[in-house]
Amino acid sequence: GLMSTLKGAATNVAVTLLNKLQCKLTGTC
């Protein structure tokens, strides 16, 4: 459903942002 799609998209965005943040903090990209 729509909520499932939105939840999946939000999760993808959150993971991407966390990866970028970790990349900047730890220098492991």
Curated annotation (Swiss-Prot):
Subcellular location, record wording: Secreted
InterPro entries from the UniProt entry: Antimicrobial_frog_2
S-S bonds: C23-C29
Tissue and organ expression note: Expressed by the skin glands.
Key word Nuclease present: no
GO biological process: defense response to bacterium
Alphabetical keyword list: Amphibian defense peptide, Antibiotic, Antimicrobial, Disulfide bond, Secreted
GO CC term, one of those recorded: extracellular region
Annotated Pfam families: Antimicrobial_2 (PF08023)
Function according to Swiss-Prot or TrEMBL: Antimicrobial peptide.
Family as reported in the entry's similarity comment: Belongs to the frog skin active peptide (FSAP) family. Brevinin subfamily.
Protein name (database record): Brevinin-2Rc
Organism whose genome encodes this protein: Pelophylax ridibundus (Marsh frog)
